[in-house]
């Protein structure tokens, strides 16, 4: 049984668009299964709703332990920190990267695609869409590259996830995209897109948008994906960046 939650105040007087990084900081400061009564206190406005608050804490790697409570313009959520990764996102992103779900290694290191054999960061560096290795904050702040996953539950293998999780996660990411409006969205791994949108989808620009933003889908960057070479992944990242710059 989880102990009574400690109280944390997050985002006091800040724009709602800054809450994802503030919640990411909270996630990093806690241990798995820590329980928190989180008071979200951003600047009030039409974009601030209980639904958005719930989406943001899920994206930050927490599980709500009850319904949101509204106190004036504040939203209070009792939540539990899970073994996962937080969204690293903000307004004015050039490209939003959407993965499937965190691996235990990535969750342990608090960095997406952290495993040495994963080719995400080498390919992103070679493509020029980032300039620091395995540093999501630097990628966001200096290159407008945001990172999220369809599902926040950490598993050894993606096939441990079910379609309902993909659908729920897809809906959350679509709301996130419609709100923050990145120039384009890049799905890393075809499995999630195929599970929800088009089971016959292939790599490249998709006909369907996400939150009214153009979408590029590319193969997974895992070193186990022997069908895709590093130079192929570099070309995919460059094509996704070009899509963003045309948007």
Show which residues each predicted segment covers.
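Short, well-ordered beta-to-alpha junction loops that form the rim of enzyme active sites
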Residues: 41-43, 100, 187-192
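C-terminal capping/extension of enzyme domains
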Residues: 2-9, 39-51, 60-68, 72-90, ...
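An N-terminal amphipathic alpha-helical segment
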Residues: 1-37
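Short N-terminal binding/cap micro-motifs at the start of the first secondary-structure element
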Residues: 104-108
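Short, hydrophobic/glycine-enriched beta-strand segments
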Residues: 88-100
């Amino acid at each position: 049984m989880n102990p009574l939650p400690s109280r944390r105040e997050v985002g006091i007087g800040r724009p709602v668009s800054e809450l994802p990084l503030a919640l990411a900081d909270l996630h990093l400061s806690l241990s798995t299964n820590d329980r928190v009564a989180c008071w979200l206190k951003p600047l009030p406005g039409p974009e601030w709703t209980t639904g958005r608050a719930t989406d943001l804490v899920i994206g930050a790697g927490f599980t709500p332990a009850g319904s949101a409570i509204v106190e004036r313009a504040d939203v209070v959520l009792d939540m539990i920190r899970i073994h996962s990764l937080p969204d690293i996102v903000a307004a004015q992103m050039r490209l939003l990267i959407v993965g499937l779900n965190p691996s235990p290694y990535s969750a342990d290191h608090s960095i997406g695609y952290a495993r040495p054999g994963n080719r995400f960061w080498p390919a992103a560096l070679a493509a020029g869409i980032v300039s620091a290795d395995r540093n999501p904050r630097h990628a966001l702040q200096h290159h407008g590259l945001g990172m999220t996953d369809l599902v926040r539950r950490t598993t050894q293998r993606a096939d441990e996830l079910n379609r309902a999780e993909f659908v729920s996660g897809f809906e959350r990411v679509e709301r996130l995209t419609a709100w923050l409006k990145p120039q384009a969205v890049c799905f890393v791994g075809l499995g999630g897109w195929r599970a929800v949108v088009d089971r016959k989808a292939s790599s490249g620009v998709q006909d369907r948008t996400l939150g009214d933003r153009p979408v590029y889908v590319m193969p997974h960057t895992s070193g186990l994906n022997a069908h895709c070479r590093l130079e192929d992944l570099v070309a995919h990242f460059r094509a996704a960046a070009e899509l963003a710059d045309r948007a």
